[in-house]
Amino acid sequence: MSVTATIRIQQADFDVAQEIAALSKGRTDVGAVVSFSGICRGSENGEPIAALTLEHYPGMAEAEIGRHADEALSRWPLQGLTIIHRFGRIAPGENIVLVVTASAHRQAAFEAAEFLMDYLKTNAPFWKREESEKGTSWVEAHDHDDAAAARWTKS
């Protein structure tokens, strides 16, 4: 059975439980479902955050995420894959991103989800701006995020 990833880039929030259920309900070939949901924090380094604004390059973002989803599907035996990433102004407590992987066994589901999140955190064409009492500032990837993503590079 050929698996196609579900990829959505949207402004609206999403229901994590509903997305997980949609991927796994009634499936007898799925033995493991792993999900990661990224949520907007209300503070960074002790400083309150009013909101995040995520910008993306339409078309390019979908294509790049699709390319990495295809790589995950070729590297791990997945029965299902959903990636949702929001853009626009996001308030603390709201969802930002969701990755759900389904496989017959847990190792493939965990590794594929981690691979995809490491990519999304470091190289996906999204730009994040924090709003705080001090003003706005662009958020850069951290060194530890780059190191996590580098471990998936094929030699």
Name each region found by the language model.
Residues 1-96, 110-114, 118-155:
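N-terminal, polar/charged subdomain of small-to-medium soluble alpha/beta proteins
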Residues 96-103:
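Short glycine-rich or small-residue beta-strand-to-loop segments that form or flank ligand, phosphate
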